[in-house]
């Protein structure tokens, strides 16, 4: 992703956050603040600590001087000294949403002259659409709103090439609703899967899915990444539909952002690269839909090298045992990404039962040696099939 693209995403992401937080503020104030905050981020990230502190102080002074038109929630914060004032403003709750009319479609999907605007004017119009949509949908996560905005931009790009563009883009509102519905459905399906499988088996399923998508990652990286995904699902899935969507989208944004930074440092594969670089707004759906990496050639694997059948397993904490089991599962998937999932699960279940049985045996080590050979044989049979 280019530096210019990152800056645009940064400004537009800030604009969404600000429009949700300050729904009573007008567009010009929100657009100015978004630019100022993004510029301050850049200064601070470049390591200029003096300019960063001064810039932050100036920004908070400006916000407090404009609190009457920005937010009714800032008054207690603006009475505090620095640095408490800034932290208070950032963590303050969203202002009460005013009684807004429906999205002014006459300006965005019913205006016959949209395509005749200059590029600069069209860019302003797109930002204003983002502002108007965001303040009307405080319940939606930033990535979902950016998804709607991306679809709107693509719609105009396609329709403005036609003889009758208005007829083409006048269906915009239905398309926006489909984007939100699709985002809801993806999260609902994930949460339904977790409920059906239970937490442990759900994490195992994530191991299988993401090992297929990114087999170049080490088994440890895959275990940690999917553990974070499973934890996010445990936190978000019990929430109601609206909160569930926002919670999962925000969590995925952070986790996939970390994965993409890993890819930037040490490339994983073309599929991951495509999802990271192509569209920030559609990053999560892209990863959801990513299939088996057919280019990956796994180094030869001997089952006795990856199946840890030693007495110290009996002393392991439950989490350590689960991690060992999931590493084994990831190794198997790397070898046979197209094998039926039931075959993986069969070996994993046998592994768990063997550990339980041998740990209860009087001579655990002897049990592991005797019973373990059968498991290794079954494992080698899968790899050889």
Predicted ranges, named:
Residues 1-385:
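General marker for long, soluble alpha-helical cores
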